């Protein structure tokens, strides 16, 4: 048989040989050495005859090779070859003799002729591969048949929604691929009458269908074992290396209920020095869970067994061969998954539900993917979900030899030899962060070393703070977790029953991406806070993207960002029933968040504020975010340099946008506050800048200590449009500028400006110009709590009345004998000195439209509040036509 190209180390057996060479069934016998043959002998012997015209078999008995173990086809050995392509590579030399070949690139089947050709042992692709493309081939020798019909391939392109296809050839067997991916005949398709293949799901337009057809059904090894070798006329006890009969081996494999049981019960007895690779079936013959190819890696003596991708048998590392991510269903324990993850540089796809008895610990360069409708469940109240945790060394440290400025990239240290280029370091001091409410947090940053020159460390970003020797600055080496991608996690579910603390906890990390998550919390729906229970905690991490992540019913926060976290983006996320959807927090000893972007996120029904900047942090931006039905403020502002762009706060219990202690340099652009229980915008701590914003249907539209309101609107705010002094410390009041705003009267909004004397507010620090205050008349302001009349605000070019026939605010008049009296209720003059009133007078602009031959200087006199005013020329012969306009 060896001379004919059949080697027994492929586990060839007689019925297969008979089919391959077209011999009559049962014509080939297993003979022992000698000159005669009986059906009871088990060694091959050749008698010198011509074998069906194929060739002379020879005269010597083949005594060196015996049939030792015949493995069923669902667990059969197969010869494979794999390689990783270089960029532009097209040719691969296959180091085996073969007659048949099936080729995959990156897991997708390739079509002969269209995608590749074979010449001798050289496989040539029709297009260049890219660097890292993975080639995987199955090869056979010899061909099962010279009949082309056994190797026929039928291809087609699907129509949108197509579920059936009729093959135009007769066939008995079919192997089906969709877009190059092998389909499971149990779950993906079925074969019916009239050559019709029915798919279990609708196909998409132009899906590529590839069907490999066969005209005959070759008896499977399982059938041969049962029907040929194990009937009453055959030998039932052909021994295997384990000492069991083939039937016993088959029964063990058939009844094994997990991949690990198969490995430990059966495969541990295999001589892996002789066998290159085996295929192991899954839990049952009808499922593929755990199925795969395993090989002995004789170069590995250290990999730890994980029960899914590596098994240690007699100190040999038996490894799973696979392309793409490992599957969680391969592992039988959480410890096994953590062992697999412990090395880093791995990818894992969760393809079945998993109850966590402990947290999953993630290392650098790890990708985690989760199938749709797959859940991770916590098993108890102390179980966290996923942890990415680095550390800061307490021994590999050094100190400064000179102070470091906030803009510097260079750090001069006492001993740079402790560090290497590429190391991450923590730089921290005992100096508190800025702000009146620093909460004991001290300045700190994470940086990467880009260059070392003597005792100078060059860092990848500026220092941000002034680090000094006097503040006991310390530089410590860090062991961080970096380059982690988590995609599609669903943690817990809406019908949760188990309390747990944190779903994902990231500490000392760099370059983290978390996408497409559904994170259900651990408190009763729409009840109060449960401290310490957060969906995503980002502590002292850099370069983090959280995208399309949703969190529900969190006892504490949806996303919490703290420590010296930097360059963190939270994008397109949804938070329901959390204390805060996003909280910029202070609970780490060193460092404050910096450079944080919250974009296109929504919070609903938060226990307190929908979005919170909690006491510290700087350079934080909320863009296109929405807070609905917040239990406190929609957006709470207590950090430095916070910017809000095109955000909405609707139906908050208190303020739409509410400022607290610690807020400095707040800026709101294009934001909208509607239907909030107290203030639409409340900047009563450090003031701020409001531009192009709208306050609609709140109690007060704007509550301000100082700052600017520019190009903004205030409509239907029930108590007043602008409240000067609410919850303010008068000692901190500074100038408030209102310019080019639209604050009109309505039956709901009956006052434009409210000055709180009880808060000691000084109206003269308020300037209002170019603003529409039409409709209020003399009721444009309200004073409260003053014991004596305050000074009036500075007013310029504001519209106070709606232009009408009885109250015209502008018009033209021709002077008679140098004078004219205008009757209009729009003219205002307040001379009262009581504590509840302000003194003011209308500003009347005059412009000569048509001059007479005698002109003089124009002036206003005889203003009667709400009645009239007089225009007078210094020349009593002046008969010019004058345009007049009243403003406040």
UniProtKB/Swiss-Prot annotation:
GO cellular component, one term: virus tail
Family as reported in the entry's similarity comment: Belongs to the K1-specific depolymerase family.
Primary localisation category: virion
Lineage: Viruses, Duplodnaviria, Heunggongvirae, Uroviricota, Caudoviricetes
Function of the molecule: Functions as a receptor binding protein (RBP) and probably mediates the attachment to the host capsular exopolysaccharides. Displays a lyase activity that specifically degrades the K1-type polysaccharides of Klebsiella pneumoniae capsule.
Organism, scientific name: Klebsiella phage K64-1
Domain of life: Viruses
Protein name: Depolymerase, capsule K1-specific
One Pfam family in the UniProt entry: Beta_helix
Alphabetically ordered keywords of this record: Degradation of host capsule during virus entry, Degradation of host cell envelope components during virus entry, Host-virus interaction, Lyase, Viral attachment to host adhesion receptor, Viral attachment to host cell, Viral tail protein, Virion, Virus entry into host cell
Segments passing through the bilayer: none
One GO term (biological process): symbiont entry into host cell via disruption of host cell envelope
Gene: S2-4
Molecular functions per Gene Ontology: lyase activity
UniProt KW Calcium keyword: no
Subcellular location: Virion
């Amino acid at each position: 048989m060896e001379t004919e190209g059949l080697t027994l180390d492929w586990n060839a057996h007689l019925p297969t040989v008979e089919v391959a060479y077209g011999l009559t069934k049962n014509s080939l016998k297993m003979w022992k050495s000698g000159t005669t043959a009986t059906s009871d002998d088990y060694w091959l012997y050749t008698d010198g005859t011509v074998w069906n015209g194929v060739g002379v078999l020879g005269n010597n008995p083949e005594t060196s090779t015996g049939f030792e173990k015949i493995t069923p086809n669902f667990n059969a050995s197969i010869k494979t070859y794999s390689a990783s392509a270089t960029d532009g590579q097209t040719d691969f030399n296959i180091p085996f003799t073969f007659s048949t070949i099936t080729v995959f690139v990156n897991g997708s089947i390739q079509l002969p002729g269209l995608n590749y050709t074979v010449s001798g042992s050289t496989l040539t692709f029709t297009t260049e591969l890219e660097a890292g493309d993975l080639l995987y081939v199955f090869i056979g020798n010899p061909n099962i048949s010279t009949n082309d019909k056994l190797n026929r391939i039928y291809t087609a392109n699907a129509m949108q929604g197509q579920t059936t296809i009729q093959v135009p050839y007769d066939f008995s067997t079919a192997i089906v691929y969709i877009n190059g991916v092998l389909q499971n005949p149990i779950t993906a398709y079925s074969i019916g009458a009239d050559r019709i293949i029915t798919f279990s799901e609708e196909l998409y337009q132009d899906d590529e269908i590839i069907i490999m057809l066969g005209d005959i059904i070759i008896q499977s090894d399982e059938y041969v074992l049962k029907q040929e070798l194990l009937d009453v006329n055959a030998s039932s006890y052909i021994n295997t290396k384990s000492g069991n009969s083939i039937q016993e081996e088959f029964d063990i494999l058939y009844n094994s209920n997990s991949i690990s049981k198969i490995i430990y019960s059966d495969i541990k007895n295999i001589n892996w020095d002789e066998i290159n690779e085996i295929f192991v079936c899954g839990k049952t013959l009808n499922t593929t869970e755990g199925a795969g190819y395993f090989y002995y890696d004789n170069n590995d003596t250290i990999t730890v067994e994980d029960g899914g991708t590596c098994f240690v048998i007699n100190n040999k590392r038996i490894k799973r061969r696979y392309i793409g991510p490992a599957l969680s269903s391969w592992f039988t324990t959480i410890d096994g998954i953590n062992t697999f993850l412990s090395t880093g540089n791995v990818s894992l796809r969760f393809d079945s539900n998993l109850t966590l008895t402990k947290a999953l610990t993630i290392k650098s360069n790890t990708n985690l993917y989760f199938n749709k409708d797959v859940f991770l469940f916590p098993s108890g109240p102390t179980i966290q979900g996923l942890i990415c945790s680095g550390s800061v060394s307490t021994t590999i440290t050094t100190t400064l030899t000179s102070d470091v400025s906030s803009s510097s990239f260079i750090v001069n240290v006492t001993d740079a030899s402790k560090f290497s280029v590429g190391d991450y370091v923590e730089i921290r001091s005992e100096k508190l962060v800025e702000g009146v409410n620093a909460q004991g947090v001290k300045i700190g940053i994470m940086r990467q070393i880009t260059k070392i020159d003597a005792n100078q460390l060059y860092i990848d970003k500026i220092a941000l703070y002034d680090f000094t020797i006097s503040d006991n600055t310390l530089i410590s080496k860090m062991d961080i977790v970096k380059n982690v991608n988590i995609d599609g996690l669903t943690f817990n579910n809406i019908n949760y029953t188990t309390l747990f603390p944190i779903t994902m906890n990231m500490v000392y990390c760099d370059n983290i991406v978390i996408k497409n998550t559904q994170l259900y919390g651990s408190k009763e729906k729409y009840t109060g806070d449960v401290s310490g229970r957060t969906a995503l905690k980002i502590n002292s991490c850099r370069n983090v993207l959280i995208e399309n992540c949703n969190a529900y019913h969190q006892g504490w926060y949806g996303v919490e960002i703290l420590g010296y976290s930097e360059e963190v983006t939270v994008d397109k996320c949804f938070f329901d029933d959390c204390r805060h959807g996003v909280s910029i927090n202070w609970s780490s000893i060193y460092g404050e968040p910096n450079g944080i972007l919250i974009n296109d996120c929504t919070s609903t029904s938060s226990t307190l504020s929908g979005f919170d900047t909690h006491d510290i942090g700087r350079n934080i931006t909320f863009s296109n975010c929405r807070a609905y039905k917040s239990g406190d403020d929609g957006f709470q502002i207590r950090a430095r340099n916070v910017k809000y762009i095109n955000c909405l706060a609707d139906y908050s219990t208190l303020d739409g946008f509410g400022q607290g202690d610690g807020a400095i340099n707040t800026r709101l652009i294009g934001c909208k506050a509607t239907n909030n229980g107290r203030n639409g915008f409340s900047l009563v701590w450090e003031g701020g800048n409001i531009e192009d914003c709208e306050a609609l249907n709140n109690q007060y539209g704007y509550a301000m200590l100082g700052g600017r309101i520019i190009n903004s609107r205030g409509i239907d705010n029930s108590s007043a449009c602008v409240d000067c002094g609410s919850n303010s410390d008068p000692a901190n009041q500074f100038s408030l500028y209102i310019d080019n705003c639209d604050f009109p009267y309505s039956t709901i909004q009956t006052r434009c400006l409210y000055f709180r004397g009880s808060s000691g507010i000084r109206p003269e620090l308020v300037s209002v110009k170019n603003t529409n205050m039409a409709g209020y008349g003399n009721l444009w302001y309200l004073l409260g709590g003053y014991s004596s009349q305050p000074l009036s605000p500075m007013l310029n070019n504001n519209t106070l009345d709606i232009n009408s026939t009885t109250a015209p605010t502008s018009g033209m008049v021709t002077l008679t004998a140098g004078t004219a009296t205008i009757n209009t209720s729009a003219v205002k003059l307040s001379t009262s000195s009581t504590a509840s009133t302000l003194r003011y007078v209308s500003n009347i602009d005059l412009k000569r439209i048509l001059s007479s031959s005698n002109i003089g200087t124009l002036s206003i006199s005889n203003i009667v509040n709400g009645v009239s005013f007089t225009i007078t020329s210094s020349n009593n012969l002046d008969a010019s036509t004058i345009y007049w306009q009243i403003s406040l």
